[in-house]
Design a protein with these regions (language model features):
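Conserved C-terminal helix/tail region of periplasmic/extracytoplasmic solute-binding proteins
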Residues: 220-290
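Short helix-initiation/N-cap motifs at beta->coil->alpha
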Residues: 29-31, 99-113
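Periplasmic solute-binding protein
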Residues: 1-30, 50-71, 153-162, 234-243
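C-terminal lobe and pocket-closing loops
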Residues: 127-134, 144-237
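Glycine-centered hinge/linker elements that transmit conformational signals in sensory
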Residues: 35-36, 72-101, 131
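A structural signal for multi-pass alpha-helical bundles of membrane permease subunits
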Residues: 312-601
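Paired acidic/hydrophobic, glycine-rich loop segments that form the ligand-binding mouth/hinge
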Residues: 117-122, 136-138
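Short, solvent-exposed loop/beta-turn-alpha elements that line the ligand-binding surface or hinge
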Residues: 66-86, 142-152
Length: 601
């Protein structure tokens, strides 16, 4: 084979078993499930794992004779074997063998509380469990349905050297030492890593590490993960197929056909190479025009006099200009330049405006079809309008309430209501995602208390969108509240008193006096809040994750997927970013003119 680096650790999944619930080893998964049902408490599960993740589904797929990608890196998650594996996992969910909407934190909680007899997880869980529970680790068993073993995917951590580093003997020597038996023993004993040295595991010093040895045994029969780009591009469509089947939205065969179509679309050949001559000519013409205008200005005596008079002022702003150039202008220029290229970072190909044409023509498909720029733009606009409406409405009401001088504990309320804004957005997003979990989330628990039915919040666009909005409104209303409270302090009391003397009711005073005086402050805050919300990546990515099937993705999260989950198409993602910038710049300019016109009137 081809040597990419020096391997230092293996990673794969294995079976963690609660010894109090399943004291004996079972040859098949079905036997383990039957044994676990006899002892698990009511509401518990025989097995827990991240069923909607293709990495954790791979052992089931291999047991049915299927593969995620073939030896050439082509998407192979199709056919009868793949469909049978999806149907099998769906049956596990239907028969309450596994929980709904699982994740790593939920698996750990269920296992440690004795509500899950077994979990499928990687070695990291051993460090989290400690001695709080009696458990053992086993290689994954066979499936009685097929008689074949559940072989996990095997990944390898390795030491790599750059081209310059590989030419230095000391770098090669260090890499070899890190992969040696001596260093491997240290990583096993101190780092609890599964080193890829079978002979090392025969050392008597490691005989007591039974759980770690089980991972080493599992790694020996695991399926090595393909190092091709096709493998990287397979995760997203495979995950979506799993989620559709588990939700019951599609039959396995239809979900797999759609997954293959999306993989083909994401990995289709890049646009043909374009000539850079038009770009060079355009940049040259722009440079000449700029130089010509600069020469004309420099030859003007009045301009030279103004420059000499302003030199001291320029000295004060030079550092700020340099910072803006380094942190704003140059990154924007680099992003715009990247959008004109395709291919990998090591072998870029100039394609001109092909990325923009592909985005704006929906890659040759329906302009409002799944994942198109225009459909995602509509979702983004809806997302922005709804959020800003609630931000302003709630912020205005709370700001007015907290500005009443006779309100008791006013300072305490202000601090408490500002806290959602002070907490990092990703922390809040993860907390809200947990609250929207179908089986164990606080929101559904409240619905049950009120006599309602639990809701699968991320199974439909309306509920997933509502979950995202609720999270972002919680994050955003304190900003508007603070703006309103600050603006209210600038309203002269004598104006309000004069309106009251004239017989204006409380509603009339708010509508005809307070609100018009708040508008000059509120409108810029609304524009700023709209820009923030338009690009609110954390909430969309961490709460709904774009579910269901990417329908709640906004433009910035769609750009992220093209950059990092769809074959690393950085040029395509950069074109998305440029279009987002142009939309925001145009919108800000439009509203800026409106603000200027209203201020003048």
């Amino acid at each position: 084979g081809v040597r990419y680096g020096v391997p230092v650790a293996n990673k794969c999944v294995a079976l963690y078993v609660n010894e109090d619930l399943v004291p004996s080893v079972h040859a098949t998964l079905e036997e383990l499930v039957r044994a676990a049902r006899e002892k698990i408490p009511q509401g518990g599960f025989p097995l827990a794992y991240t069923a909607d993740n293709a990495y954790f589904h791979a052992p089931f797929l291999h047991a049915f004779g299927g593969r995620l990608v073939d030896d050439t890196g082509t998407f192979a998650f199709v056919g009868d074997e793949a469909a049978a594996s999806l149907a099998f996992v769906r049956s596990l969910l239907v028969h309450h063998v596994i929980p709904e909407e699982p994740n790593g934190a939920l698996e750990k909680q269920l296992f440690m509380s004795g509500r899950a007899a077994a979990v499928i997880e990687s070695p990291w869980l051993m460090g989290e469990l400690g001695t709080s529970i009696r458990y053992r680790v086993e290689p994954l068993p066979k499936l009685a349905a097929t008689g074949l073993p559940m072989r996990p995917l095997l990944t390898v951590e390795a030491v790599f050297a750059t081209k310059a580093g590989a030419a230095r003997p000391i770098a090669r020597e260090l890499a070899r030492w890190l992969g040696s038996a001596e260093a491997g023993m240290t990583r096993v004993l101190d780092g609890q890593q599964v080193v890829p040295r079978p002979a090392l595991w025969k050392d008597p010093a490691l005989s007591g590490l039974t759980n770690l040895r089980a991972f080493a045994t599992a790694a020996e029969s695991a399926e090595p993960m393909s190092p091709t780009s096709g493998m990287q591009a397979a995760w997203e469509p495979a995950n979506q197929a799993l989620k559709k089947v588990l939700r019951g939205d599609q039959e396995p065969e239809a979900a797999l056909v759609e997954a293959k179509r999306r993989w083909d679309d994401n990995t289709r050949p890049p646009p043909p190479k374009a000539s850079p001559t038009p770009l060079i000519a355009l940049l040259g013409a722009a440079s000449l025009a700029f130089a010509f205008m600069l020469v004309l200005r420099v030859r003007d005596p009045a301009f030279r006099h103004e420059v000499r008079a302003s030199l001291p002022a320029y000295a004060y702003v030079t550092h700020a200009v340099l910072v803006v150039l380094a942190l704003v202008v140059f990154p924007l220029a680099a992003g715009a330049l990247t959008s004109l290229f395709s291919g990998t970072r090591d072998a870029p190909r100039y394609v001109g405006l092909a990325n923009y044409v592909s985005i704006l023509t929906a890659r040759g498909g329906d302009l409002l079809g799944h994942g198109s720029f225009y459909l995602t733009l509509l979702v983004t606009v809806l997302w922005t309008v709804v959020n800003v409406f609630f931000h302003v409405s709630i912020g205005l009401v709370l700001g007015l309430a907290l500005s009443r001088p006779l309100l008791r504990l006013r300072a305490v309320y202000r601090v408490l209501l500002i806290l959602p804004w002070a907490v990092p957005s990703y922390v809040t997003a993860l907390a809200w995602k947990g609250m929207f979990q179908r089986q164990f989330g606080a929101v559904n628990a409240l619905l049950r208390m009120l006599g309602g039915e639990p809701v699968s919040w991320f199974s439909h666009f309306s509920t997933a969108f509502a979950a995202n909005v609720a999270t972002n409104v919680w994050l955003g209303f304190p900003f508007m509240m603070v703006v309103v409270m600050g603006a209210l302090t600038s309203i002269p009391k004598d104006v309000l008193e004069a309106a009251e003397v004239d017989g204006a009711t409380r509603g009339q005073r708010f509508r005809l006096v307070t609100l018009p005086l708040l508008k000059p402050v509120l409108l810029p805050a609304v524009v700023l809040g709209a820009v923030w919300t338009f690009n609110m990546f954390n909430v969309v990515f961490l709460v709904s994750g774009g579910e269901p099937d990417g329908t709640t993705d906004i433009l910035v999260s769609e750009a992220y997927r093209w950059a990092f989950t769809r074959d690393n198409q950085y040029g395509y993602a950069a074109a998305y970013a440029v279009l987002i910038f142009l939309l925001l710049a145009g919108g800000s300019r439009f509203f800026g003119r409106k603000l200027t016109a209203e201020g003048a009137s």
